[in-house]
Structures are given as C-alpha cells and as structure tokens.
C-alpha cells in the first residue's frame, strides 16, 4: 500500500527539517532542496522517490545509505545518489550509528505538482 499521509510519513516530514525550498526548472519539472539535521535517527520509514533521482550530501556529521547495494557510512563532504523509485527505509539490517548526528542537504528533481516522496505502509 502506498500512502503519503501515514503517521510515520508525517513524523518523518517534520523530523529534522531545517528548510525546504522548491524551484521551478521549467518543462514541468521542479527541484526540491531540503536541509535536515537529526541525531540518533536510526532508519527512516520505508519509502521511495518517484523523482529523476536524489542526491544526499553530508554537510556535517555521519549518515548511511544502502544505495550502492551494501551499507556504506558517509561523513562530512561526502554524498550518495538514490535512483528513481528505489524503495528504502525500515531495513532490519541497518547498522546502528548510535548517538551520531547528521546535517544533510537533500536535492531531488521531480515532476511539478507530484509527490516527491511516497511512504509504504
């Protein structure tokens, strides 16, 4: 089941959100730029992005992703790319980062007026 208004998605949307901007790119496309700061977050709820792709840049701290097929830790000035429609979040095998904090810049391009993040119940 796909949902954009579940309790988990509402918490995630607010959790750590410092800023969120949308830029009209023309041609029916928008660029979404979010800045998120979190500590001891663990994993996020299961979701995917029906977008042209997502770039996650670590401004400060440490984060992790399985976008390469295996878990990798990223720190200051490192980034990873998430392919369109890649389902992630809620992984039972996610390494525990403990009390680690992260300051992330998330950049994604999506069709204008469409949800750029879809949560899976």
Regions inferred by a protein language model and the residue ranges of each:
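Single conserved hydrophobic/aromatic residue that forms the stacking wall/gate
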Residues: 1-8, 12
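Short acidic-glycine-tyrosine-enriched beta hairpin
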Residues: 38, 68-86
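Short, charged, solvent-exposed linker or helix-capping segments at domain edges/interfaces
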Residues: 116-121
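Ligand-binding loop in jelly-roll beta-barrel domains
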Residues: 70, 85-115
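Histidine-centered metal-chelating micro-motifs
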Residues: 43-45, 64, 80, 84-96
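Glycine- and acidic-residue-biased ligand/ion/polar-headgroup-sensing regions
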Residues: 51-69
């Amino acid at each position: 089941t796909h949902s954009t208004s579940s309790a988990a998605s509402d918490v995630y949307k607010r959790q750590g959100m410092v800023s969120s901007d949308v830029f009209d790119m023309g041609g029916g496309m928008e660029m979404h730029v979010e800045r998120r700061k979190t500590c001891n977050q663990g994993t996020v709820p299961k979701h995917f992005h029906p977008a042209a792709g997502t770039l996650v840049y670590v401004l400060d701290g440490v984060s992790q992703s399985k976008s390469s097929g295996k878990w990798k830790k990223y720190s200051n000035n490192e980034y990873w790319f998430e392919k369109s429609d890649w389902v992630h979040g809620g992984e039972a095998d996610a390494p525990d980062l403990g009390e680690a904090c992260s300051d992330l810049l998330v950049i994604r391009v999506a069709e204008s007026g469409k949800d750029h993040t879809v949560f899976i119940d």
